[in-house]
Amino acid sequence: NEYWKKKIPKKIIGDIKQIDIYKNGRLQIIFRTEDKFYVLDRNGNEVKELSFEIDSGENNIPISIFDYEKNRNYRFLVTNDNIIEMFDSRGKKVSGFKPNTFESIIIKSPVHIRIDGKDFIIIQLENGELKILDRRGRDRIDIDEKIQFSENSIYSYMKTFTTTDNQGYLV
């Protein structure tokens, strides 16, 4: 049975996610296209006050959703080419987050990892740089070594970070 369908004018980038923005037990659907962040209610209607236009780039990657305190105060990281911005669940830019423009294109959705109460936002760049930021967008750890990233994401492992390079080595 088809419950509803909706025509989206541009291709959806990444997975469609469900979250409870209103904290009422009813899930909303969120996703992005090259130039818009969408929030749809459970009936497929666009929640216009929460959907917003975003700058489009040539290398648009899926949004990242962070819920730092697990209290449904969501943060959305939107990237375009080499720029990263953070929005709150009302579609407003987070004033405490410093938008970043990197020297190279972002190649994967940013990842949030918490270790010993500290938040790390991890970003992989096309030039092999690994950027590790705090929750305000400032550099938390400087990494000098370049990595030829594989398709794998970055994970927390024994209070550190791990991924694989394109040769299959754990780094």
Write out the residue ranges for each language-model feature.
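Extracytoplasmic/lumenal domain signature
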Residues: 1-171
